[in-house]
């Protein structure tokens, strides 16, 4: 919702100021289809060349995540803290024997089932269970557990950030692609140099639409979406840090 409002403000302010200053919108409207085809087509083609199929597929999901924002709510963080307290309390009271059945089948465990939203994130649940198991067999070395968890979190973040990095590269390249489209427009104009001034002016104006579109798409569309996706990924990664902090703190205090 907030993203949509932002895009509306961009369009109203950019094109509204142009029209209010006496600009001829028909020049932009006439040049827009073929300039957009050149810029968007080149950007999408370069995106396909530069990225794996997995990253390309995740990019669409990533854009949707940028619009939706982080998936975790305040209650989810409270539930996660409660879950970690319950799990670690069970381990403290009953040891590894009491905890292992819950780790083997968390979807059937009475410790996990009260929190269905957490259970839906299979990677988070696996992360919790794997390192609790590691703690039960290597309880005397909390630093090793911490190092392993840091490496796992970093690996997960790197995998999740692939589409965001690809979108940011696309955003960085769009102004240059706008120049490419503008140069093509100038070449077309030079082929009609014998035309009247009015026609040449309209053709040059249409060519400049390419530069305009490249910069607009970069800094007002793709770039902001990439930044919002990065913010979303960082927010969605916080539960892993919470789990790591809880497990390491428990291990170090024993």
Task: Please report, for each region that a protein language model flagged, where it lies by residue.
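Helix-termination/interfacial motifs at the ends of transmembrane alpha-helices
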Residues: 5-8, 12-27, 145-148, 152-230
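Large intracellular
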Residues: 2, 19-161, 235-254
């Amino acid at each position: 919702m907030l993203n949509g409002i932002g895009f509306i403000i961009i369009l109203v302010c950019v094109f509204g100021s142009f029209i209010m200053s006496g600009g001829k919108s028909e020049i932009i409207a006439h040049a827009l289809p073929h300039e957009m085809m050149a810029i968007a087509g080149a950007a999408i083609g370069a995106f396909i060349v530069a990225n794996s199929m997995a990253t390309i597929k995740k990019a669409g999901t990533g854009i949707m995540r940028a619009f939706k924002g982080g998936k975790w709510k305040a209650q989810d963080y409270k539930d996660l803290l409660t879950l970690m307290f319950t799990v670690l309390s069970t381990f403290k009271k009953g040891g590894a024997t009491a905890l292992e059945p819950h780790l083997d089948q968390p979807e059937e465990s009475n410790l996990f089932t009260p929190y269905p939203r957490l259970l839906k994130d299979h990677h988070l649940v696996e992360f919790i269970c794997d390192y609790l198991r590691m703690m039960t067999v290597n309880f005397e070395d909390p630093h090793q557990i911490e190092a392993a968890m840091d490496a796992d979190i970093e690996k997960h973040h790197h995998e999740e950030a692939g589409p965001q990095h690809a979108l940011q590269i696309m955003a960085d390249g769009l102004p240059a692609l706008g120049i490419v489209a503008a140069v093509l427009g100038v070449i077309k104009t030079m082929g009609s140099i014998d035309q009247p001034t009015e026609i040449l002016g309209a053709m040059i104006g249409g060519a400049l639409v390419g530069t305009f579109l490249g910069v607009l798409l970069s800094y007002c569309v793709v770039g902001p979406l990439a930044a919002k996706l990065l913010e979303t990924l960082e927010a969605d990664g916080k539960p892993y840090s919470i789990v790591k902090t809880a497990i390491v703190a428990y291990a170090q205090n024993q």
